[in-house]
């Protein structure tokens, strides 16, 4: 494969190589929401199920829709390679409160918090409609707030506040506490990015 977009294609090619060496039995024992059927892993992200053939790593959207962008496919490969099923205990954490959160807070703030604030806080009704379309659970916090089932037992909440003449729009993103041990910090950033992009695509 000729690499043109190094920022996205080089990481994908790296994890694609590791994916080819996976033992499907080890993966499905470690990540119990994933199944392996007819030579392919099946994994559900934000309500959409994808088949990823093994070992050749061909993605198929089982709903017949479009394939996710390359960073999302890389995220799914990393989920199969590195994550594990950890039960959700019912508590929530900010990104900063999780391990290495302070080190990654600057890219996280730009890619997730600021983006969520100005994408959704300026169009609260459209955000609400998109979240409902995705099957999210409405929350009583913020001007609009919703809880999303991201992948497996991992949940995320987005709360938005509409801006006015005095204050800019604002947003908070919360992670189910199992993210702290189930995902590397860079994957928590990507999870926020994926969630925002998915909601935006439905607005």
Give short role names for the model-derived ranges.
Residues 1-39, 72, 80-134:
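Short Lys/Arg-enriched alpha/beta "domain-start" segment
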Residues 27-54, 137-162:
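Amphipathic, interaction-prone secondary-structure segments
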Residues 48-74, 161-186:
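Intrinsically disordered, low-complexity regulatory segments enriched in Ser/Thr/Pro
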Residues 122-181:
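Conserved binding-pocket/active-site segment within a compact domain
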